[in-house]
Amino acid sequence: MSEFITVARPYAKAAFDFAVEHQSVERWQDMLAFAAEVTKNEQMAELLSGALAPETLAESFIAVCGEQLDENGQNLIRVMAENGRLKALPDVLEQFIHLRAVSEATAEVDVISAAALSEQQLAKISAAMEKRLSRKVKLNCKIDKSVMAGVIIRAGDMVIDGSVRGRLERLADVLQS
């Protein structure tokens, strides 16, 4: 877990509440995603770690973001820069997405497999996870050859490891004990 998660939570909540009130949740998520990516840029990371005045840092950051930020998004950047919190933007995005998922009664579910899954397989996984979590799910499918076969399903703190790799690891643990 990131060191900025506690710092990010109030900014994410404020941004989310504002976005809901102004019916612009999708736009805000896009703005936060772009701003979070900007913080990952090597040159911007140096600026964020430097000794620039908050006003200068905020204006530089806003200039880099260009038209990707509306006036309200720019105001959030200014407040975060003033408080020395721009490095927390990736965590603000993460918390914003979490608040949106809770609000929309959806859950992000990562499905990791060795090969692409068929629509039928994805539908079965989706139905099973919706039943288990009692909410709608959004599947994020990833391919990882190291899984070998089977799938790994992650939803929040829950992990269901039905992969061959996981079974081999568990077997190795049993044999070593």
Curated annotation (Swiss-Prot):
GO molecular function: proton-transporting ATP synthase activity, rotational mechanism
Main subcellular location of this protein, as a coarse class: membrane
Subcellular location: Cell inner membrane
Coiled-coil regions listed in the entry: none
Membrane topology: Peripheral membrane protein
Entry-linked InterPro entries: ATP_synth_OSCP/delta_N_sf (IPR026015), ATPase_OSCP/d_CS (IPR020781), ATPase_OSCP/dsu (IPR000711)
Disulfide bond sites: none
Listed SUPFAM superfamilies: N-terminal domain of the delta subunit of the F1F0-ATP synthase
Annotated Gene Ontology cellular component terms: plasma membrane; proton-transporting ATP synthase complex
PROSITE patterns per UniProt: ATPASE_DELTA (PS00389)
Organism superkingdom: Bacteria
Its job: F(1)F(0) ATP synthase produces ATP from ADP in the presence of a proton or sodium gradient. F-type ATPases consist of two structural domains, F(1) containing the extramembraneous catalytic core and F(0) containing the membrane proton channel, linked together by a central stalk and a peripheral stalk. During catalysis, ATP synthesis in the catalytic domain of F(1) is coupled via a rotary mechanism of the central stalk subunits to proton translocation.
Subunit structure: F-type ATPases have 2 components, F(1) - the catalytic core - and F(0) - the membrane proton channel. F(1) has five subunits: alpha(3), beta(3), gamma(1), delta(1), epsilon(1). F(0) has three main subunits: a(1), b(2) and c(10-14). The alpha and beta chains form an alternating ring which encloses part of the gamma chain. F(1) is attached to F(0) by a central stalk formed by the gamma and epsilon chains, while a peripheral stalk is formed by the delta and b chains.
Similarity section: Belongs to the ATPase delta chain family.
Protein name: ATP synthase subunit delta
Species assigned in the record: Escherichia coli O6:H1 (strain CFT073 / ATCC 700928 / UPEC)
Gene: atpH
